[in-house]
Amino acid sequence: MNARADAFTIGPAAFRNRVFLASGPAGYGTEYAGLINLERLGGVVTKTITFRPRAGNPGRRLWETEAGLLNSIGLENVGAARFFAEKLPRLVESGARAVVSLGAEDWDDYRSLLDAAARSPDVDAVELNLSCPNVDRGGMSIGSDPSLVERYVRSAREALPRSAIIAKLTPNVADITVLARAAADGGAHAATAINTLVGMDLAGDGAEPVFRRVRAGLSGPAIFPVALDAVWRIAKSGTLPVVASGGIASVRDARKFLAAGAVAVEIGTAIFRDPGLPERIVDAL
């Protein structure tokens, strides 16, 4: 392992290497403990937590495409109280370096969520999900507005002064570097690029949308070139350190992200079919 995979820091948080599990596919983190040695990874980003429990979207939630995966999960989660009391301590006890993904439907819930996070002794790093495309409120509707990105990031920085603040950005805008600048102005220590692209599919040969919400988030190899472009542009702008997420399916993909200027990489959808990939990337870098 060379210096690209060795220990590094994002703001006040130290990580053992540059290979993370992305938010979403790994659930609360411990679901993959029997398949992945979580202690070997730089970090494990939890599924997104909201202040109140969410049941998620009704109907079908996952749909495979020829080069990726559409999801309409809808931020299903147990809510802040159970997460900070049960799920997060269990992940920390496993030896994983936890990065907590925080989301919100509105400003009041977001402030309450930050207060709950501030009371937890286990929150050293957070990734603000300002970019989920498959919810009615919050998510991408916040993250596509630079002024709101700055406001939400600044609030997190003030509420969690001893934690690393990472803003996860949406690619569904004209210029993602504008969002990176807004996150930096709000005090973010880094940005994650990217979240899913908006897409849809029709069932069979008919005209019936696969998902009840019609549109969903596309991940997997199909979005790798888009993610690589976003990482390249943010890195070249010098605005913020950037964590790469989107379409990694091989060691080669991870190396390309690092060559494009990423400080770390997140593996997500690929672990559904290849849970050994994150550790192989750790070994190869």
Residue positions per predicted region:
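Glycine-rich phosphate-binding active-site loops on the catalytic face of alpha/beta enzymes
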Residues: T46-F51, A125-C132, A190-M200, G247-I248, ...
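N-terminal capping/small domains of soluble enzymes
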Residues: M1-A98, A104-E105, I281
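Generic structural signal for well-ordered alpha-helices
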Residues: Y32, A80, F84-L88, Y110-D115, ...
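Glycine/Thr-rich beta-alpha phosphate-binding loop at enzyme active sites
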Residues: L69, P133-S147, L179-L240, R280
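Glycine-rich beta-to-alpha transition loops that act as phosphate-gripper elements at the mouths
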Residues: A26, S101-A104, L169-D175, F224, ...
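Catalytic cores of alpha/beta
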Residues: T30-I36, D109-S120, V173-G186, A235-L240, ...
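Hydrophobic faces of well-ordered beta-strands that scaffold small-molecule active sites
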Residues: V19-S23, G42-T46, A98-L102, V126-L128, ...
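C-terminal helical cap(s) of enzyme catalytic domains, especially alpha/beta-barrels
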Residues: L38, G56-E66, L202-A216, L258, ...
